[in-house]
Amino acid sequence: MARVKRGNIARKRAKKILQLAKGYRGAHSRLFRIANQQVMKALRYSYVGRKQKKRVFRKLWITRINAASRLNGLSYSRLIHNFKKSNIELNRKMLSQIAVLDIPTFNQLIAISK
């Protein structure tokens, strides 16, 4: 059986990883093994971060809605309950935008839901 030489393939692989590790400090951007570990860790963090971003934004929207609704003497949970009863189907992102950017409209929504 013929001997398989993998010089080009190994170089390509290492180059690809080092390219991804560009901008890392010290050996993390220069040495293949360490760079490989850091790239894998970074990819793991970015994957997890994409999931966490959704949670963080939802939490932010709820906080904003709660703050705006408390100015009108309602808690967040009471407000959402009233919206459900009144068939006002706005998601939390939209409600948050309205609460921050268009306060009179938000106050009207609260008045309608009461």
UniProtKB/Swiss-Prot annotation:
It comes from the Eukaryota. GO terms for cellular component: chloroplast; ribonucleoprotein complex; ribosome. It is found in: Plastid, Chloroplast. GO terms for molecular function: rRNA binding; structural constituent of ribosome. Gene3D superfamilies: 6.10.160.10, Ribosomal protein L20. Disulfide bonds: none annotated. InterPro entries: Ribosomal_bL20, RIBOSOMAL_L20_CS, Ribosomal_protein_bL20_C. One of its GO terms (biological process) is translation. Keywords: Chloroplast, Plastid, Ribonucleoprotein, Ribosomal protein, RNA-binding, rRNA-binding. It holds the Pfam family Ribosomal_L20. Its main location: plastid. SUPFAM superfamilies: Ribosomal protein L20. HAMAP family: Ribosomal_bL20. Belongs to the bacterial ribosomal protein bL20 family. Binds directly to 23S ribosomal RNA and is necessary for the in vitro assembly process of the 50S ribosomal subunit. It is not involved in the protein synthesizing functions of that subunit. This is Large ribosomal subunit protein bL20c. It comes from Trieres chinensis. The gene is rpl20.
